[in-house]
Amino acid sequence: MKVRASVKRICRNCKVLKRNGIVRIICKDARHKQRQG
């Protein structure tokens, strides 16, 4: 899980989710997991 100020989709399988005001990226490639913080 990368924690970044700016989260962007890395590949076309990445999906942007917003849970409780936290922006997350989930992807089938585990290296692409990110959250904003």
From Swiss-Prot:
Full protein name: Large ribosomal subunit protein bL36
Record GO biological process: translation
InterPro entries: Ribosomal_bL36, Ribosomal_bL36_sp
PANTHER family: 50S RIBOSOMAL PROTEIN L36, CHLOROPLASTIC, LARGE RIBOSOMAL SUBUNIT PROTEIN BL36C
Domain of life: Bacteria
One Gene Ontology cellular component annotation held by this UniProt entry: ribonucleoprotein complex
GO molecular function: structural constituent of ribosome
Assigned keywords, A-Z: Ribonucleoprotein, Ribosomal protein
Family: Belongs to the bacterial ribosomal protein bL36 family.
Signal peptide: none
Species, as recorded: Methylococcus capsulatus (strain ATCC 33009 / NCIMB 11132 / Bath)
Pfam families according to UniProt: Ribosomal_L36
